[in-house]
Amino acid sequence: YFPKRARSRLHVECSDRWDPDAQQLPVRKVAQPGIDADVAHLDFDNAFEGWKGPARIRDEKCSLQLRSSLPYLVVYTPRDKDYFCVEPVSHIGNAIHMADPAAHGLATLQPGETLEASMTLDVAML
């Protein structure tokens, strides 16, 4: 979670957005050629595909770049809250119930197997 400040801005390069159903489960993929906007004007609770990283967050106090080895990104920007979330994830939520879970990032691990991921946050105070 990140504090939503007066000039919080989010920049993400991606190709698609997953829209949720009434239960907030991702069910429909639509084209979304990136995000570049003030967070106060966004209303997302979505997963994004084709994330090329880094995700950039900037406001009057700091500049942040988020990089990850994970291929999907969840962005949550509730309009009535003083925070927002930008979260790399390994798979689309609800992937286990989709026709081809692996195509949506869900990895099946055998006993003893592991899955590794990394994330880096570079922060500069302004």
Annotate each predicted stretch with a short phrase.
Residues 7, 15, 72-73, 83-86, ...:
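Generic secondary-structure boundary/loop-capping signal
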Residues 1-69:
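Active-site/ligand-binding surface loops and adjacent short beta/alpha elements
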Residues 89-102, 108-110, 114:
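Catalytic-pocket segment enriched in acidic/His residues
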Residues 107-125:
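Short Pro-Gly-centered flexible turn/kink motifs
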